[in-house]
Amino acid sequence: MFVLSALLQAVIISIVVIIVLLTPIFFILGKFKNKDKVSLKGIKTVVFNLNELVEDYIISTISVNKALSHEALLKALEHLADDKKIEKIIIDIDEIDLSRVHIEEIKEIFEKLSVDKEIIAIGTTFDEYSYQVALLANKICMLNTKQSCLYFRGYEYKEPYFKNILATLGVTVNTLHIGDYKVAGESFSNDKMSEEKKESLINIKETLFQNFINLVKEKRKVDITNEILSGDLIFANSEKAIQLGLIDGLSTYEEIGIDYNEDTVDFLEYVSAYKRKKNKSKNTIAIINLEGEIDTRESKESIINYDNVVEKLDELEDIKNLKGLVLRINSPGGSALESEKIYQKLKKLEIPIYISMGDLCASGGYYIATIGKKLFANPVTLTGSIGVVILYPEFTETINKLKVNMEGFSKGKGFDIFDVFSKLSEESKEKIIYSMNEVYSEFKEHVIQARNISEEDLEKIAGGRVWLGSQAKANGLVDELGSLNNCIDSLAKDLELKDFKLTYIRGRKSIMEVVSAMKPQFIKSNIIEKIEMIRSYSNKILYYDENLENF
């Protein structure tokens, strides 16, 4: 074991040395590469294709994140709208991967683009997601091949429940929750879905389904509810799509005007080549992204914790004429304690804080958001989930099956709390629930103060209930429906700023931090990931809802 440890240490040291030696070379090569930038001279057509988009990324000395950031996307589209030389935008549906929120956030800009530019969408397979992107265009075409089709379905939700399989191993995972709809972790403790969870998920799924139906009605003047539910639009060919008025015809890439040898560039090439306008304003609004689960660990690339939030907030001290801060939150929640520590740190800031919610701003994410003077959500943001949950596993039956005899001694009570080899007594369980109620009370106090709502009215919309942004606006959990740009503009307007510039605060990692985070990547089964989640969050009081991450 010692030899293996020494060998591993030697390998890591070697990697660090190699990286340090090669970094200057990478830097030089990067400088040469930058000289080959695409020229926009004579360019009239931009192909909008985007396979990867991130809300936030880490700046390190040895790596560059090649994915386009959310704000870079918005900036580039705004510039494109003002670029009189660009006459046509072609949306390549097969090369687009955007979330619901990202689609919503670019709608307004595409409406501006369509005023003086031709926008055409083309693709082979249109599902509900990609078709919503296609609806940004003035004209929708299928690629002229018999392989092109529509693939519209209703909705379904499935997830595995592990109680019985864990029982065969002698493992029991207990979940305690404050709030009937705070159902995180029930897939470990139950053998089937609770009615509360089913009700909550059906509410979200049905609303999203109706949103899609209504959007198609608005844009294409056709109701396709019956066709979808009957399965008629599963692998529906171009003839069916034209008949229903869902597309305008068939075409090839060349016929719609894609010619990379003449006047066409991809969107990312346009982003790298267009000339940025210099902003000489003295007024600054800072943007900080908080993305990922809220936890103390750094095992995942996207984690929100007190330390990395403090690092970002410390950078605000170096910004001259800082007028306000926009927090962009994209999180399903996590540690209750970490959420409170972040909340307290933000509370000390003497500038107005506005909140822009991404795909997710639920549980601990919403907890942090309550610090905001004004909260913006997208209509399809998942938010709320005001409640508390705790998971604690027991292995008493496991050691019995293995014929292991636990021997020891104690003086006093409470040693069964969070001892995985002891059954939890009712007395200890009551103490845990008392502590959870205290934490829940603190959560509600923040919401009551931030939203100016009575505790009685709050309970009607809390208890772990999850809401779409449009619903959260109706029940008072957010102030406005809008994009990141809308949030920024609102802050500037309320501050009465005639002009302003934006400064984006990024996390930073050293060479050693990047190398230490390097681990072999293996394909993980859903079960393994779930077990790792139990291990990570066991015995911690949580503001968390794991069901929302891949919803």
Give residue ranges: language-model regions.
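Charged, glycine-interspersed solvent-exposed loop segments at helix/strand-loop junctions
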Residues: 162-259, 396-481, 485-490, 495
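Flexible, low-complexity junctional segments that flank or bridge functional domains
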Residues: 2-44, 82-87, 112-119, 124, ...
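Domain-scale detector for complete catalytic domains at protein termini or as standalone homologs
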Residues: 19-20, 322, 475
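Intrinsic disorder and flexible/low-complexity segments
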Residues: 282-285, 289-322, 505-551
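Short glycine/threonine-rich loop-to-helix capping motif typified by GTGT followed
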Residues: 337-342, 471-474, 517
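C-terminal recognition in membrane/secretory proteostasis and scaffolding
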Residues: 328, 401, 504-506
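Cleft-lining beta-strand/loop regions that shape enzyme active-site pockets
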Residues: 38-39, 43-159, 278-398
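C-terminal intrinsically disordered, low-complexity extensions immediately downstream
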Residues: 485-517
